[in-house]
Amino acid sequence: MTYKIGVVGDKDSVSPFRLFGFDVQHGTTKTEIRKTIDEMAKNEYGVIYITEQCANLVPETIERYKGQLTPAIILIPSHQGTLGIGLEEIQNSVEKAVGQNIL
């Protein structure tokens, strides 16, 4: 099975991902972002990149997919910079897998 890769965020931050062949969706409101993530999850997206700012608006939606194999939801910084929550999520995952923070 081939999975698709999607990107969700504000237009300025995510439009460049089209160059890599990713499916880019713009969203700025909770409703738009939640609906986009749910649609991507239903439509066989293996990875969804989402800007930290958008993820901050829908933490319950992000949390709902954490326990599932797909989609993997990866937080990325926006064009405005990072909030640090994406790196924190990676550190938590590594610590959970390895038993300590090696980053």
UniProtKB/Swiss-Prot annotation:
Family from the record: Belongs to the V-ATPase F subunit family.
Protein name (database record): V-type sodium ATPase subunit G
Keyword Cytoplasm: no
GO molecular function: ATP binding; proton-transporting ATP synthase activity, rotational mechanism; proton-transporting ATPase activity, rotational mechanism
Record InterPro entries: ATPase_V1-cplx_f_g_su, ATPase_V1-cplx_fsu_bac/arc, ATPase_V1_fsu_sf
Annotated GO biological process: proton motive force-driven plasma membrane ATP synthesis; sodium ion transport
Keyword terms, alphabetized: Ion transport, Sodium, Sodium transport, Transport
Protein function: Involved in ATP-driven sodium extrusion.
Pfam families per the UniProt record, alphabetical: ATP-synt_F
The keyword Iron is assigned to this record: no
